[in-house]
A protein has these predicted regions:
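Amphipathic alpha-helical binding modules
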Residues: 70-101
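Charged, amphipathic alpha-helical oligomerization/scaffolding segments
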Residues: 15, 19, 52, 83-86
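Short terminal alpha-helical segments
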Residues: 1-34
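Extended alpha-helical scaffold/tether regions of large eukaryotic proteins
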Residues: 4-10, 39-42, 81
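Amphipathic alpha-helical interaction modules
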Residues: 21-65
Length: 101
C-alpha cells in the first residue's frame, strides 16, 4: 500500500513524538546531572523539558521527512507546528509522569 503525502506527514509526526518521549528518562538524567549545574540557570524543569522535547521532535521529524524526500509546503509546516504546539499541555502531563517533575 502506498501512503499519500498527507498520510506520510501525519505518520512521521506521530513516530517522531513517540521516539522522543521514549528518550525523556535520558534527558532527565542529563539535565539533573550536578556536573552541568543546569538547575542554576533553568528556572523551571518542566518548561526546560517541554522545550527540549518540542525541539527534538521537530528535529527528528525533519530527518524523517528528508529520508522520505518530502519538503513540506508553508501550509504543511503551519499544520505541523499547530498540531505539535497544540499538544503542549499533553506533553507537559507526560513529562510530569515520565520524569516526575
Amino acid at each position: 500500500m502506498v501512503l499519500s503525502r498527507e498520510e506520510i506527514i501525519k505518520e512521521q509526526l506521530g513516530r517522531a513524538v513517540k521516539d522522543i518521549l521514549e528518550q525523556l528518562p535520558w534527558m532527565a538524567e542529563v539535565f539533573r546531572n550536578p556536573t552541568y549545574d543546569l538547575n542554576k540557570t533553568v528556572e523551571s524543569e518542566l518548561d526546560f523539558f517541554l522545550g527540549a522535547v518540542l525541539s527534538e521532535i521537530l528535529e527528528r521529524y525533519t530527518q524523517y521527512l528528508l529520508n522520505k524526500q518530502i519538503k513540506p509546503s508553508a501550509e504543511e509546516f503551519a499544520w505541523i507546528n499547530q498540531t505539535l504546539f497544540s499538544r503542549a499541555n499533553e506533553f507537559k502531563d507526560l513529562i510530569r509522569k515520565i520524569v516526575q517533575v
